[in-house]
UniProtKB/Swiss-Prot annotation:
Ranges where the record places region Disordered: 116-139
Name this polypeptide is given: Small ribosomal subunit protein uS12
Known function: With S4 and S5 plays an important role in translational accuracy.
Pfam families (alphabetical): Ribosom_S12_S23
Keywords associated with the record: Methylation, Ribonucleoprotein, Ribosomal protein, RNA-binding, rRNA-binding, tRNA-binding
Species annotation: Mesomycoplasma hyopneumoniae (strain 7448) (Mycoplasma hyopneumoniae)
Signal sequence, renumbered to the chain: none
Length: 139
């Protein structure tokens, strides 16, 4: 509990909060050339580059990522989850928030099974995360 003299020196300061996915919190109105703060769960974009990256120290792999120019004009790096993909330059993708722990600078994931992105083939468990359809039952 603060004393009166402590409160007289200055009131309590609210903690400032910074978004972990800033590109999803901005909307661009091209008609009026204005930027608005409006958060969205997903954003559509066009791939400008598809490449691989090596993860941070204890891990070793070639992780796939894409540079995506979003519909609000911001360009971000997005991780391509799952094994194998069909993405190339000019592919239209949908991105969601969520960083990859061992890839610095990647704060977004590409949603598999939407737009030009196909789902992961032969995926039987955790299918919804990778856009895979339910396998046909064999008799």
């Amino acid at each position: 509990m603060p004393t009166i003299s402590q409160l007289a020196k200055g009131c309590r300061v609210k903690k400032t909060w910074k978004s972990k996915v800033p590109a999803l919190n901005m909307l661009y109105n091209s008609l009026h050339k204005k930027e608005l703060k409006l958060s969205a769960p997903f954003k559509r974009g066009v791939c400008t580059r598809v490449a691989t990256m090596t993860p941070k120290k204890p891990n070793s792999a070639l992780r796939k990522f894409a540079r995506v120019k979003l519909s609000n004009g911001i360009e971000v790096n997005a991780y391509i989850p799952g094994e194998g993909h069909n993405l190339q330059e000019h592919s239209i993708v949908l991105i969601r928030g969520g960083k990859v722990k061992d890839l610095p600078g990647i704060r977004y994931h590409i949603v598999r099974g939407t737009q030009d992105t196909t789902g992961v083939a032969k995926r039987s468990q955790g299918r919804s995360k990778y856009g895979a359809k339910r396998p046909k039952k064999s008799k």
